[in-house]
């Protein structure tokens, strides 16, 4: 089965072709980072308009890359939610228009299911079941993944997502957009232990997260720097140490909760997915813990940690392979800006 995947939930336009026999044939991605940088965050109206401009050129690119003709495609998968309503509508409209013109069925995909399954795109994919740490700008969850469509929420953030905390910390420190990669980069130059921040809910006894207090601690520390009248090189060094303290605290919590989830479920496989899954400090800490405690940890390719069409095409192929009745051939659709992953079922 050959599936075209279309991702448009936020500020990346992604298209890809995935074949159940040959794997990922082609994927192309356009990021809107440069467009939103002047605003310090994603502007939904601009995001929607840019998806309209980018989708068809990206379609032509993946078709040319793979030597695929429209008659070769069996179905079209699109991100149905969650995400920005306007952005989702653009992707859904394009998917259904193509499907109508080409006489193909469609299938709507949960954006987070795409992330959960994205590590299956690697050469040696993890078998089911596994624990998944889903960590991004909008979500931080621990899930037990028993099979495609069988997901149990073990823990989740009670306030800010980890990626959101990274972005807000970057803004408090005075870094550019997007903040997450910038604060991680700065943290690598900081001195370990120079600034020690709280580890929220580290010993809460459950698998939930909270990152709003960590963000507040960063703000408090920045005010101390101002009161001390740090400037020039001293201020830059203090900011680097603060970034290091923040990243160390966030990573400690993510690793500890992941280990607790593995212990609770008695599973030996951890899958890390979502944009923050590209963070080098997090990967290093989880890999070290895996080596010490004897479990396997799996990551998507770095290029597939961000939103992308490949994960949507894969999820579409897996769903239609197991539940052909989910194929939609009447081209009526809705989008779901809010959509609980645990509500999915085969």
From Swiss-Prot:
GO terms for cellular component: cytoplasm. SUPFAM superfamilies: Actin-like ATPase domain (SSF53067). It comes from the Bacteria. InterPro entries: ATPase_NBD, Gcp-like_dom, KAE1/TsaD, TsaD. One of its GO terms (biological process) is tRNA threonylcarbamoyladenosine modification. GO terms for molecular function: iron ion binding; N(6)-L-threonylcarbamoyladenine synthase activity. Its EC number is 2.3.1.234. Belongs to the KAE1 / TsaD family. This is tRNA N6-adenosine threonylcarbamoyltransferase. It comes from Burkholderia cenocepacia (strain ATCC BAA-245 / DSM 16553 / LMG 16656 / NCTC 13227 / J2315 / CF5610). The gene is tsaD.
């Amino acid at each position: 089965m050959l599936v075209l995947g279309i991702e448009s939930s936020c500020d990346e336009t992604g298209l890809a072709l995935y074949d159940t026999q040959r794997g990922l044939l082609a994927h192309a991605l356009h990021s809107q980072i440069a467009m939103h940088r002047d605003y310090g965050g994603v502007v939904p109206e601009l995001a929607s308009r840019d998806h309209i401009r980018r989708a068809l050129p990206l379609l032509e690119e993946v078709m040319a890359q793979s030597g695929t003709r429209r008659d070769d495609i069996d179905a079209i998968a699109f991100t149905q939610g969650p995400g920005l309503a306007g952005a989702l509508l653009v992707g859904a409209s394009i998917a259904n228009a193509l499907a109508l013109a080409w006489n193909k069925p469609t299938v709507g995909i949960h954006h987070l299911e795409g992330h959960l399954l994205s590590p299956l795109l690697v050469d040696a994919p993890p078998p089911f079941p596994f624990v998944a740490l889903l960590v991004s700008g909008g979500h931080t969850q621990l899930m037990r993944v028993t099979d495609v469509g069988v997901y149990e929420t073990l823990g989740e953030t009670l306030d800010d997502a980890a990626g959101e905390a990274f972005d807000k910390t970057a803004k408090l420190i005075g870094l550019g957009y997007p903040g997450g990669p910038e604060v991680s980069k700065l943290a690598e130059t900081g001195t370990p232990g120079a600034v020690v921040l709280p580890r929220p809910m580290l010993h809460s006894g459950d698998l939930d997260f909270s990152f709003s207090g960590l963000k507040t601690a960063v703000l408090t520390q920045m005010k101390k720097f101002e009161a001390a009248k740090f400037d020039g090189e001293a201020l830059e060094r203090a900011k680097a140490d603060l970034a290091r303290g923040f990243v160390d605290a966030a990573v400690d919590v993510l690793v500890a909760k992941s280990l607790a989830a593995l212990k609770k479920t008695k599973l030996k496989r951890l899958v890390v997915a979502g944009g923050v899954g590209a963070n080098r400090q997090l990967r290093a800490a989880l890999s070290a813990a895996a080596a010490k405690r004897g479990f396997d940890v799996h990551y998507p390719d770095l290029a597939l940690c961000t939103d992308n069409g490949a994960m949507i095409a894969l999820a579409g192929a897996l769903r239609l392979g197991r539940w052909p009745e989910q194929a939609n051939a009447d081209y009526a659709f809705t989008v779901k800006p809010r959509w609980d992953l645990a509500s999915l079922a085969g």
